[in-house]
């Protein structure tokens, strides 16, 4: 079947830069979906997205749908006609459904059947609807109208190119009549651009100073920014989201180096970087030591004959913003950081839980407790907790919310606070996302865990639990943050004790009955998802959860040991044996004796198992106490043979009550050894 290239380009006013890439991808996906639904095959497809246009090129698109046959089965013959051979309502209804007379229905089989040959339509007849549907389905939160038209789109449309082969597809979409005329660069080539063919689309626009390919513009910007940064003996900060946004702002990218006064470098560089990136869309430069250079790179949308004028203009624009940051920094430093707590006493953390200052006091006490438990400095952790929210009341954070914690760090250093106390003011918010950086100091870790536990206990205490996708206080993230810090930093904290301490801090503001258990359950449930992501089966998590370790680090060490144990050849048999033992002991009447009496043994397998258990107990107890769970389970794996022999040779529920009770006691000893690590019966 013959095929031609197809091109559609919708010209608009400037599209939202943060949405341009996703709009282009969605446009392509919609076209591909429509072609597939229509049964039109093609060789390849690609999207073009620039500030004033969205386009899709489809290579070697079939010119015609294939013919197809449609067979519809109706009611059985017996139900289709009465005794006199007249069609019943069922038969007549089937004919109406098929859009034909009953005489055209095939009655030769067991059921009525209608066979229809459907000739394929020309692709050119289908393309307008496919394009229109794709545009209608674009992820546009809020569409707009313009002029007196009723059409709606993300921005007013200006032109439409639609070519199938060399011919224009005759249609009108979004108030634009299709043609072959596009537009060039707004300044370099502000004229009509005739698209000679779909295949020449990109080159025709390139000659008019428009790089329609988003990926090409992105690569040019990235490469040129790196080259310019290297020429300045620096490295550019190029966040992917910023690179995408800048790419979406320009049709003909020309990166240029600009500078600012070195006096601004006295301001925390994070504030300068924030305002230059977020407000001005500049790429900042760092030296080899990670310090901000007094230079930045802007990306112009024009190849100017006088680039110095563009540079000068950008330098003038950025100066007031840097001056503002400098002013806020100097104003904040006029008083001690701790003094800002007075303002926080009037700022509500949560209506039922008190002020932000109340929270800081709770975090201070809890951070001191945690630091003491994990080997940190209690006094410095408590100090960091007290200062932890102070910068929220500063001018700097008021203007740059993303500076919370960072501003506190600089102000604490300015006040002469210890380095780890200052760092903790920023590290309290770590990790800021999945896989993000963790606190580098024990003081920071203590404050970070304390802050999250305080929030969990408080919000749970007033009954505002997360439901479904709603989690306004980010409690799931807080719980995962606690777990990551304690496990990945190797901090052995009894979480039950820490949560109890946190509950006590609220002193009547929350419903404390069962609160600690509820919070612990929520936190440890988050571990389940963590392990699933790591490829560890739920049964392994459940085996450890059954013995209820309250230290996340201890919990993780047990999980890793059970995961390794599962790979041993003895694991399956021992898990099954433990399950059998668990079932037997659950049915024991009158409890199970604590001591095993060897004189009640009447089978060699009992003596052998008892001796093996005693030997394993001596080896395993010190290993379990030292949390060498891998080694402990490896030792216990040696019990497989005596356990198998015991169950093969002995009837546990002997008729003699004393013998039966003694065998229960022996099995209880066996099960107790494994429960020192995990309940491996769950694995069976």
Swiss-Prot record:
It catalyses: tRNA(Gly) + glycine + ATP = glycyl-tRNA(Gly) + AMP + diphosphate. Its EC number is 6.1.1.14. It is found in: Cytoplasm. It comes from the Bacteria. InterPro entries: DALR_anticod-bd, Gly-tRNA-synth_bsu, Gly-tRNA-synth_heterodimer. Pfam families: DALR_1, tRNA_synt_2f. Keywords: Aminoacyl-tRNA synthetase, ATP-binding, Cytoplasm, Ligase, Nucleotide-binding, Protein biosynthesis. GO terms for biological process: arginyl-tRNA aminoacylation; glycyl-tRNA aminoacylation. The keyword Cytoplasm applies. The keyword Nucleotide-binding applies. One of its GO terms (molecular function) is arginine-tRNA ligase activity. It is an enzyme of class 6 (ligase). One of its GO terms (cellular component) is cytosol. NCBIfam families: glyS (TIGR00211). Belongs to the class-II aminoacyl-tRNA synthetase family. Tetramer of two alpha and two beta subunits. This is Glycine--tRNA ligase beta subunit. It comes from Ectopseudomonas mendocina (strain ymp). The gene is glyS.
